[in-house]
């Protein structure tokens, strides 16, 4: 089984948008993990990938040539003073969860963010997403907030928690 990380220093390929769109749309349509409610087109996803990866680290995980997960950093807030803080995002194909891929992706992302002199990373997680919360805790993130009933999806009010990882002392 061949596995590889493809990232921003190598380039995200246009063809990756197809797999990334499929992975993300699964979470949009069938879960409360993403707060988006309408599936994205490949064109929309490619546009996002190009925009994000031009400024921030973006990594894709492949197994046997198939994209099964991805993660990236992006702006946490738009004001200039926040420029050394980034928000993290990680998604895996549901068939590939629980195999350590999310950990590998996030470790690479954290390393790259350190190399780019980010000071802090923030993960905004749906409170019911136990797997993501556990992943972030294992990676050293600490919960710093809990917002109650801030999202409505599938006729259900959802809480969101923020986790923070300080990259420098």
Regions found by a protein language model. Give the residues of each.
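Single conserved hydrophobic/aromatic residue that forms the stacking wall/gate
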Residues: 1-7, 12
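A structural signal for short, well-ordered beta-strand segments
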Residues: 88, 121-123, 163
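Conserved beta-strand-loop-alpha-helix junction that forms the acyl-donor binding cleft
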Residues: 97, 123-133
């Amino acid at each position: 089984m061949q596995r590889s990380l493809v990232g921003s220093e190598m380039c995200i390929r246009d063809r990756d948008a197809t797999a990334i769109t499929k992975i993300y749309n699964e979470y949009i349509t069938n879960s409360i993990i993403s707060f988006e409610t309408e599936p994205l087109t490949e064109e929309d996803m490619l546009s996002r990938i190009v925009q994000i990866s031009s400024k921030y680290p973006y990594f894709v995980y492949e197994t046997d040539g198939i994209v099964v997960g991805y993660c990236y950093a992006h702006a946490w807030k738009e004001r200039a003073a926040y420029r050394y803080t980034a928000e993290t995002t990680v998604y895996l194909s549901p068939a590939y969860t629980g195999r350590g891929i999310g950990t590998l992706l996030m470790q690479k992302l954290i390393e790259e963010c350190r190399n780019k002199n980010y000071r802090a990373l923030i993960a905004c997680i749906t409170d019911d997403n136990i797997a993501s919360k556990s992943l972030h805790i294992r990676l050293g993130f600490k919960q710093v907030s809990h917002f109650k009933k801030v999202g409505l999806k599938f006729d259900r009010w959802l809480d969101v928690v923020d986790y923070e990882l300080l990259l420098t002392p």
